């Protein structure tokens, strides 16, 4: 001690000078004590060092206050936005780390920092102030942010890295603030019920709350919870050295309560909240600093009625006055998917729409989709004119609810609602607004997915043939459709059916009956009536464009019919009454099997009066049948109006892409000629959307593309035209053929001798009748033709003469 005191007594002035000479080292008295300088060993006394050190470079000043019971604070929509959106974005940024805590001038060796910067500020302080409801208005918080950035620019050189980092953060700050609600409104905050179960510090609080009259002090927690005195609601006072109950009339006095209350960082004591009876404590779950709950009913509370801190709210981006569950968007969505399956199946297109909706609500797009999750809360956001401008609000939660309730009949209704939501956004907000950019981004996602909408699968229905066929349709539609699919398959079917007829020859000839005879006669008369109808329709109605393939088939059928007729004539000469029957079914089967038309004219059994069995009538029926098919199916208008399946459209798109450049002009011409809405569009930049094109346009495009690519058509409606015959000639030919058949049918009615035998058992349906008739006649014709091959040519000529 003497060594230390002696130099002090001898050289007080030198001691001071020596300390000044230490420079920056002297700024930290602790350092000097631990590492004394050898040069100034005589002046290193603790008493001398302590006084000048405090004068020259004081230690870091206390950090800015984060709570002040004398200063009222509150929760507003703008402050909540600054806390949940702005602060969250800045805090996570890679350049945020220098700004997360106050500047430590001693540690960083910046002795002049606090001389230049009179009001230090950092993001950690701002964050804690937001959590503690320190601010009364958002402008105060924004002022703190600006102070933080300005301090950085004032103290550092413009070229320093820290300045560039601050500029980056400030730019993000200004972008986020641009999306902040324009009008500030105070929020009523509700507290989650189970919040007291979470958090380490809150566990200590739970043990400390006993009753309204027993309030232990908790020294480890620096926040104060204040309650009103009703006995069922406990009152907790933290950091107060004696248990006490603070009633509402005394709340104002707490502002000047002295040192014990200086550390209070909860919501100011005068913040009333809706009274919750029987709830003993509410604790914060989102921040490490628990706040207290102030019960209502305090007449002395400051105006505006403030709530506990905003950190109590779950992290949501849209402000609302009602309790909000944590926004786990995908889980409820998947659960509702299971529920929706019970309500009825969605169509393929609506399933696709549901998938789009799930994607829009997924976390992948949450960064720019969150403003559209819930309906716009105009009152909370301070948008008083919103509902004056937007007459039909829409949001994704409403779309989702409508989808679950099966309110959408088709994909167009779904798309209309989603687009309405985006158009509302564009209508209300200025074009340079952040939310407009978010809407455009989300709409791009929607439109991209919606463009991949699958076609609804066409329900298998009856072919158009059935519309023009007489009521006694006997041939199964499967036979007719298979025939039309390819000419080769039709000829194979004819051969197979002929074989079947021959196999059943003996069985069919074995038993004749009066009943069968009556059935047969009814069939023939029905055929006759059908022939009359077809003849009248052909002569009166407009000539429909015949299809090439069907005309080719007709020619084939005619030639076969002539052969069969010749064969039948020979049979008549040899076998008498039985010969016509074989020839007729064979013809009906050949013509009907190939064109599925012989069946079309058969009527139900027992339709007409009994009479002579008609031997050649089926032959006539077979001849009359082929025109029946063109009458129903040949109309190009009907064919063109047939909608395309998804696969056909996809194939057409691929084929159009294969076309050479010079052929695309014709494609554009076809589209513009048939689509009035596209006539004015620029041919250079026309955009083809197959969903909007008419079926007739698509069919015309398909024909053109196939002709360009020289592909064999997939469908039977594109068939080569017979060379050298006009439409009129073909129609006249048909007419003559029908007249000839009519004469043959009437001749058969007059000269029927013996009816077929077992057809009654096979006439449950009209198609069964036809099969039976054709098989009976075919079998007998085959057997007879073998014995009368020599006379077939003569019978053929006589047949043609009678025609």
UniProtKB/Swiss-Prot annotation:
Residues 74-180, 344-453 form the Bromo domain. Its main location: nucleus. A motif (Nuclear localization signal) lies at residues 556-560. It is found in: Nucleus; Chromosome. Residues 316-332, 641-652 have a biased composition (Basic and acidic residues). Residues 545-567 have a biased composition (Basic residues). Keywords: Acetylation, Bromodomain, Chromatin regulator, Chromosome, Nucleus, Phosphoprotein, Repeat, Transcription, Transcription regulation. Residues 634-716 form the NET domain. One of its GO terms (molecular function) is histone H4K5ac reader activity. The modification Phosphothreonine is found at residue 6. InterPro entries: Bromo_Brdt_I, Bromo_Brdt_II, Bromo_chromatin_reader, Bromodomain, Bromodomain-like_sf, Bromodomain_CS, NET_dom, NET_sf. Residues 481-515 have a biased composition (Acidic residues). GO terms for cellular component: chromatin; nucleus. One of its GO terms (biological process) is regulation of DNA-templated transcription. Chromatin reader protein that specifically recognizes and binds histone H4 acetylated at 'Lys-5' and 'Lys-12' (H4K5ac and H4K12ac, respectively), thereby controlling gene expression and remodeling chromatin structures. Recruits transcription factors and coactivators to target gene sites, and activates RNA polymerase II machinery for transcriptional elongation. Belongs to the BET family. Homodimer. Interacts with E2F1. Interacts with (acetylated) STAT3; promoting STAT3 recruitment to chromatin. Interacts with CTCF; promoting BRD2 recruitment to chromatin. The first bromo domain specifically recognizes histone H4 acetylated at 'Lys-12' (H4K12ac). It also specifically binds histone H4 acetyl-methylated at 'Lys-5' and 'Lys-12' (H4K5acme and H4K12acme, respectively). The second bromo domain recognizes and binds histone H4 acetylated at 'Lys-5' and 'Lys-12' (H4K5ac and H4K12ac, respectively). This is Bromodomain-containing protein 2. It comes from Bos taurus (Bovine). The lineage of its organism: Eukaryota, Metazoa, Chordata, Craniata, Vertebrata.
């Amino acid at each position: 001690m003497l060594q230390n005191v002696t130099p002090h007594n001898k050289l007080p002035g030198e001691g001071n000078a020596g300390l000044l000479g230490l420079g920056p080292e002297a700024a930290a008295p602790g350092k000097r004590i631990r590492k004394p300088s050898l040069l100034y060993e005589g002046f290193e006394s603790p008493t001398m060092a302590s006084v000048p050190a405090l004068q020259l470079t004081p230690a870091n000043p206390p950090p800015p206050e984060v709570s002040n019971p004398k200063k009222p604070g509150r929760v507003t929509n703008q402050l909540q936005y600054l806390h949940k959106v702005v602060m969250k974005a800045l805090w996570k940024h890679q350049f945020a780390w220098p700004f997360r805590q106050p500047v430590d001038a001693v540690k960083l060796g910046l002795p002049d920092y606090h001389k230049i910067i009179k009001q230090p500020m950092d993001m950690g302080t701002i964050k804690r102030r937001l959590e503690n409801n320190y601010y009364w208005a958002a402008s105060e918080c924004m002022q703190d942010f600006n102070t933080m950035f300005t301090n950085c620019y004032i103290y550092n050189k413009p070229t320093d890295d820290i300045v560039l980092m601050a500029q980056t953060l400030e730019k993000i700050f200004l972008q986020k603030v641009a999306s902040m609600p324009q009008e500030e409104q105070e929020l009523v905050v509700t507290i989650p019920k189970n919040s007291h179960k979470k958090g380490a510090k809150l566990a200590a609080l739970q043990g400390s709350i006993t009753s309204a009259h027993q309030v232990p002090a908790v020294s480890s927690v620096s926040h104060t919870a204040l309650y009103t005195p009703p006995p069922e609601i406990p009152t907790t006072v933290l950091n107060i050295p004696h248990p006490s109950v603070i009633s509402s009339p005394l709340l104002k006095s707490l502002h000047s309560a002295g040192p014990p209350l200086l550390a209070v960082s909860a919501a100011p004591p005068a913040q009333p909240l809706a009274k919750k009876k029987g709830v003993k404590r509410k604790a914060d779950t989102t921040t490490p600093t628990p706040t207290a709950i102030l019960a209502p009913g305090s007449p002395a509370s400051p105006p505006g009625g403030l709530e506990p801190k905003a950190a109590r709210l779950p992290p949501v981006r849209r402000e609302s006055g009602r309790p909000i569950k944590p926004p786990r968007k995908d889980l409820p969505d998947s659960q509702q998917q299971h529920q929706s399956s019970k309500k009825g199946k969605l169509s393929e297109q609506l399933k696709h729409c549901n998938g789009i909706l799930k994607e829009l609500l997924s976390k992948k797009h949450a960064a720019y989709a969150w403003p559209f999750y819930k309906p716009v809360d105009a009152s909370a956001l301070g948008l008083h004119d919103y509902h004056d401008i937007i007459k039909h609000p829409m949001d994704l939660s409403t779309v989702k609810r409508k989808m679950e309730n099966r309110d959408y009949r088709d994909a167009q209704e779904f798309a209309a609602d989603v687009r309405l939501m985006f158009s509302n956004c564009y209508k209300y907000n200025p074009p340079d607004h952040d939310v407009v950019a978010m809407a455009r981004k989300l709409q791009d996602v929607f439109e991209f997915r919606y463009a991949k909408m699958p076609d609804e699968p066409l329900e298998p229905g009856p072919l158009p043939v059935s519309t023009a066929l007489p009521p006694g349709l006997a041939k199964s539609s499967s036979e007719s459709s298979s025939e039309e699919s390819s000419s080769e398959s039709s000829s194979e079917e004819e051969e197979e059916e002929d074989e079947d007829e021959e196999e059943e020859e003996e069985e069919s000839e074995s038993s004749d009956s009066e009943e069968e005879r009556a059935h047969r006669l009814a069939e023939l008369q029905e055929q006759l009536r059908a022939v009359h109808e077809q003849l009248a329709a052909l002569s009166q109605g407009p000539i429909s464009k015949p299809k090439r393939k069907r005309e080719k088939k007709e020619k084939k059928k005619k030639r076969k019919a002539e052969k069969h007729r010749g064969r039948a004539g020979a049979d008549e000469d040899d076998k008498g009454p039985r010969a016509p029957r074989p020839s007729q079914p064979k013809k009906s089967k050949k013509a009907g099997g190939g064109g599925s038309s012989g069946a079309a004219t058969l009527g139900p059994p027992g339709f007409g009066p009994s009479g002579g069995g008609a031997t050649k009538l089926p032959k006539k029926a077979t001849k009359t049948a082929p025109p029946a098919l063109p009458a129903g199916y040949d109309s190009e208008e009907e064919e063109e109006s047939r909608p395309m399946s998804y696969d056909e459209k996809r194939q057409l798109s691929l084929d159009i892409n294969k076309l050479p450049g010079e052929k695309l002009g014709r494609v554009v011409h076809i589209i513009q000629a048939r689509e009035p809405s596209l006539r004015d569009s620029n041919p250079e930049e026309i955009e083809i959307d197959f969903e909007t094109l008419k079926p007739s346009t698509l069919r015309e495009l398909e024909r053109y593309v196939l002709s360009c690519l020289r592909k064999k058509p997939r469908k039977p409606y594109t068939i080569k035209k017979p060379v050298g015959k006009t439409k009129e000639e073909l129609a006249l030919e048909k007419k003559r053929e029908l007249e000839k058949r009519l004469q043959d049918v009437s001749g058969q009615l007059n000269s029927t001798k013996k009816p077929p035998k077992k057809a009654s058992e096979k006439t449950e349906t009209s198609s069964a009748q036809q099969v039976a008739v054709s098989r009976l006649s075919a079998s007998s014709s085959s057997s007879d033709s073998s014995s009368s091959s020599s006379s077939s040519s003569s019978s053929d000529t006589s047949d043609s003469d009678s025609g």
